[in-house]
Amino acid sequence: MSRTVFCVLLNKEADGLDFQLYPGELGKRIFDNISKEAWGQWQHKQTMLINEKKLNMMDPEHRKMLETEMEGFLFDGKDVVIDGYTPPSK
């Protein structure tokens, strides 16, 4: 049976993550408050950020910038802005 959490991003009860995917206190906060669906949304945005901004995950500054974007997206409702990207119209 999967665990459920009240997802702060989606503002609803949803399936929680199976295990803590990120280290430290931030990882615990994500595990306790973010659903699988919301984490999937973040992974999509993260991939776009890494590719479009040509981030190097070996660079501590790039990792810190990505972590800041992640916190803003998951907990503060800030959308990820990528210069020159226009989302497809629905």
From Swiss-Prot:
Pfam families: Iron_traffic. Keywords: Iron. Disulfide bonds: none annotated. One of its GO terms (biological process) is cellular response to oxidative stress. The keyword Lyase does not apply. One of its GO terms (cellular component) is cytosol. GO terms for molecular function: iron ion binding. Could be a mediator in iron transactions between iron acquisition and iron-requiring processes, such as synthesis and/or repair of Fe-S clusters in biosynthetic enzymes. Belongs to the Fe(2+)-trafficking protein family. This is Probable Fe(2+)-trafficking protein.
